[in-house]
Each structure stands twice: as C-alpha cells, then as structure tokens.
C-alpha cells in the first residue's frame, strides 16, 4: 500500500516488474 495516484479512487498495490505499483480495483 502507498499513496493513491491522482484519479484513482480505489487502488491496491501489487508487485509488478520488481516493484510495487498501484492498480485500480
């Protein structure tokens, strides 16, 4: 989990490309 990107109401952090990226739920 982390800061929610602009324009994203509900997000979950997932491991992608060796890093954690916010993905819209």
From Swiss-Prot:
Domain I-type lysozyme: 1-25
EC code(s) of this entry: 3.2.1.17
InterPro entries: Invert_lysozyme
A GO molecular-function annotation: lysozyme activity
Recorded catalytic activity of this chain's protein: Hydrolysis of (1->4)-beta-linkages between N-acetylmuramic acid and N-acetyl-D-glucosamine residues in a peptidoglycan and between N-acetyl-D-glucosamine residues in chitodextrins
Any single biological process term in GO: killing of cells of another organism
Coiled coil, from the record: none
Keyword Cell membrane: no
Enzyme class: hydrolase
Keywords: Antimicrobial, Bacteriolytic enzyme, Glycosidase, Hydrolase
Record family assignment: Belongs to the glycosyl hydrolase 22 family. Type-I lysozyme subfamily.
Name of the protein this chain belongs to: Lysozyme
Source organism: Asterias rubens (Common European starfish)
């Amino acid at each position: 989990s982390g800061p929610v990107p602009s324009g994203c109401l509900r997000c979950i952090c997932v491991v992608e490309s060796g890093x954690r990226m916010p993905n819209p739920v």
